[in-house]
């Protein structure tokens, strides 16, 4: 819901809700008021809540059923959904609810990155999705097939061949899927960075501010590096080895080891490039425009949930305009 609020506060249409995280009971009415195109449910209980909220809002909500079958892959703590073998009964139950209509099926992940060969491969889930969709079509339904996971234009052909009608671009929009880290000829270019500065030094290392130092663990451990710009001067920038606290710890700071002959000082700008997860951090989000034209400009500073961050320097620059 925090992400949905951010989308709506920006004036955008809400395409899909409840897919990764279900809508809490007490927020169902707010969710219905946002009029999402699709709303995913993991259970009949959640379907009933969504339907009732939609009915109170005077509309009929298209629901996607998350389905599963033996052999499917889930991230730990993200299991759930309807048994694909019972998808027809589940769809009938949903269609019987005032305020709801079964619009199709979804899963996650439909594709996963394979570190061994550097490709995005179909999971067993994608086959489950295809089978469930076929069963629904055979019953005379028009079916939407939502198939997210490692989504970028490089995966569209695979997903289309499996019958997908919807994808969730996610990191495809910022060019930060695992494929983009190892392939330099994809249409999308990496367009996200974590920018911070040096706080202090200790024991021969420099400590830069954390808050957004969560690296999505899609690769085996590797030596992280960061670009250090002395005093913000990128013409003099250099790479430094970095150590980031593990996910089990709070990322108060990242640690930088100066290369031989270099010094890292308080206030130096530090830039990391990794697969970010803004919603899972306390870092701010700053969209930049004008990069291709050579006139980059920060459009504002927002918290990860979409609220204006009222960052002092940006507020002062806006006031001077």
PLM-predicted stretches and their roles:
Residues 153-232:
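Active-site loop ensemble at the mouth of alpha/beta enzyme cores that anchors a bound cofactor
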Residues 205-321:
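C-terminal accessory subdomain/extension
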Residues 69-186:
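Active-site loop/helix belt of alpha/beta enzymes
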Residues 43, 47, 87, 118, ...:
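Generic structural signal for well-ordered, non-membrane alpha-helical segments
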Residues 14, 102, 198, 240-248:
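A structural signal for short, hydrophobic beta-strand segments that form beta-sheets
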Residues 1-107, 113-114:
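Active-site-proximal beta-alpha core segment in soluble small-molecule metabolic enzymes
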């Amino acid at each position: 819901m925090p992400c949905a609020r951010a989308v709506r506060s920006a004036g955008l249409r809400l395409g899909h809700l409840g897919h990764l995280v279900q809508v809490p009971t007490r927020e169902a009415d707010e969710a219905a008021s946002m009029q999402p195109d699709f709303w995913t449910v993991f259970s009949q209980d959640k379907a009933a809540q969504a339907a009732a909220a939609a009915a109170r809002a005077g509309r009929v909500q298209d629901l996607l059923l998350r389905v599963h079958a033996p052999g499917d892959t889930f991230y730990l703590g993200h299991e759930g959904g309807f048994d694909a073998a019972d998808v027809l009964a589940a769809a009938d139950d949903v269609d019987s609810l005032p305020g709801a209509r079964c619009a199709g099926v979804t899963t996650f992940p439909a594709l996963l990155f394979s570190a061994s060969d550097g490709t995005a491969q179909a999971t067993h889930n994608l086959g489950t999705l295809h089978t469930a969709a076929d069963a629904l079509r055979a019953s005379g339904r028009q079916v939407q097939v939502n198939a997210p996971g490692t989504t970028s234009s490089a995966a569209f052909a695979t997903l289309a061949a499996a019958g997908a009608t919807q994808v969730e671009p996610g990191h495809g929009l910022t060019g930060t899927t695992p494929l983009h880290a190892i392939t330099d000829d994809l249409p999308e270019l990496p367009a996200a960075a974590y920018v911070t500065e040096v706080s202090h030094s200790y024991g021969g290392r420099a400590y830069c501010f954390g808050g957004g130092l969560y690296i999505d663990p899609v690769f085996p451990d590797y030596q992280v590096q960061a670009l250090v710009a002395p005093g913000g001067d990128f013409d003099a920038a250099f790479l430094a080895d970095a150590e980031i606290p593990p996910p089990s710890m709070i990322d108060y700071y990242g640690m930088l080891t100066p290369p031989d002959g270099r010094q890292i000082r308080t206030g130096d700008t530090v830039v990391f490039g990794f697969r970010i997860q803004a919603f899972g951090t306390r870092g701010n989000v700053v969209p930049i425009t004008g990069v291709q034209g050579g006139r980059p400009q920060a459009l504002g500073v927002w918290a990860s949930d979409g609220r204006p961050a009222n960052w002092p320097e940006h507020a002062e620059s806006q006031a001077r305009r």
